[in-house]
Amino acid sequence: QAMGETQDVSLVRSEFTENLNTWIKLNNMSVVGVEPKIYTLPTKLKCICRNSKCNKPCPLAFSATNPEFAQVVDVDPRQLLRFMDSADSAQDSYLRQVFGCKSVQAEPTDFINCQKIIFQESASFIDGLEEASFENRYGVYMYTDYRLSATLKYNFEACRVTNPSTQQNYYLIRDAECVSVPRPDISEELLQHFKSVGDSCETARALVQQYYEEWMPELAIEGRPDLFGAILLTYCSVTEIPWQGGVLKGWLDTMCIGDTRTGKSQMAQKFVKAVGMGGYINGENARRTGVIGGVQRFGDSWVVTWGAIPMNDRGLLMIDEASGLEVEDIKDLSSTRSSGAVTLNKIVKGEARARTRLLWFSNPRSGRNLSDFYWRGFGAFQEFIPVMEDQARYDLVLSAAREDVDILNGIDVETHVNLGPWQALFSLAWSITSEEIKISKEVKQYVRETAKSLNEALGGGPLVVGVAVHEKLLRLSCAFAIACGAYDLKNSALELTTKHVRFAREFLEWTLNKPSMGYGDYIREFKRAQQKRADNMQFVRTLIAVHPAIKALLTATSFKGYQFQEILGIEKNESSKIMSDLITRGLLRPGSGASYIPDKLLMEIAKQMEV
């Protein structure tokens, strides 16, 4: 079959019997794993007769003296599979079968390299489940120069054949074209819509609300502008950001935790499906090997098979029902999410890039509602991932409670969003390099000042960490710059302004101070408790400095009231006042039998001050 005659077929349809031994095109195939072995196999075999005493009329008998009679056989693609992992005698056996003569011997004249690969269809629910297959398929890629790389997407020209030895199906691939994220052909007219919205809005809420109203007919979910804004900003986030001579990660890691039936997953699924960019996995039936990667047996070799995060490098992945992932699995993702690379050191070693924008959606692990947690959404988030290091990896954490939306007004679904400009905008964001992002000295100073004030207001917890606040602000600022159409086509530059940084701060405060999130209340209580602890420590240190003998009492597990007066050698009134102050501050509590029990803090300070 000629190259031009191949037809586009889905992976499912390629398995119909009518497509056996037929060259077809398989588009958007993701290479999940590659075998490290390289095979070099003959594609043409010259036939030689090894029987000098043969007197039968045969063209091979004259080929030694008459080269024009030489017989060269093109090896059938199916037979290449037979030659793999076989001795040279397999080639002789093949020719003897073709000629029906035991005297024929093979002499290879042309060769091709072959690489065993594991691949799957890269389509998720975007193209409809009935036409997509998520199971791994086995292939053999024929090449002369460069091998295929794992985690990349390709358009294959392939033929499904059966292995003559085992009858197992393989896809023999003669041509593979890499499908990279192309730099969009974007114009000033296309960017103008985003620029006009960005210029007209003075607050982050106004910008998000205007885009939300534009998308409302497509999403059909009301009352969730903060969630829409988070999805939009995650899509608009860049890959790398220049900062102080180095490069920071630019892709956003967003988490939404909420009650069931609040539309959080539905909104994200509709957005991903409409845009047609990004992958999807369900955490309920996924483990670490499916998210990061693992090793798989392929013939007599072990092959690294990469998971959903590295397979969506420089793209976006939505993890739905994330509560299905174990805490240990999420902890294992920590290094990957911060560095943008995956390293597997198992039976075989493998490395892959994983600069993947992540959208996590989850219900509370315990099945309770957000309103049942003391700290509302933040309490449910702490239950979801109790390790502070992993909590800090999330750039945005949002809540979606039932009580957030009172009444649904209904949506006019007659209009649809114009997807072309949005797809071009997201492709632009995903392909921008760190050299194209321009941050002036004035903006850098404003970022530092904003980070400092934000840390004073909301610092102390895992979601606003003092030394890393500027990184979170920069990621959100660059995403807002993209959403505002601030890309200069003439100079190929994304200019960051103080307005974008202000929008980033506003959005962070909006999500964290939301009543159903409860993070602002948690931080205020945390800071009050910290201040109280500091005051108590100062009070106890002063008390010990004035009455050194009190250390003997405070290091005891309990003591009687009269012992306080006797050991300190003070009047009863003064003794009562000191004990009253300690009880009021929560440093001393009454026990059974007229005894008093010192608080742990009190005992710690007393022990620290022992010489």
Where does each model-flagged region fall?
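Basic, amphipathic alpha-helical bundle interface domains used for macromolecular binding and assembly
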Residues: 356, 361, 369, 391, ...
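Short, mixed-charge aromatic SLiMs
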Residues: 251-267, 492-516, 603-609
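Intrinsically disordered, low-complexity regions enriched in proline, serine, glycine
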Residues: 166-169, 370-371, 489, 591
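Short, cationic-aromatic polyanion-contact patches
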Residues: 593-611
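OB-fold and OB-like single-stranded nucleic-acid-recognition modules
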Residues: 1-211, 327
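Short, glycine/acidic-rich hinge or "gate" loops at secondary-structure transitions
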Residues: 168-170, 244-249, 488-495
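Conserved ASCE/P-loop NTPase catalytic core
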Residues: 21-64, 207-432, 436, 544, ...
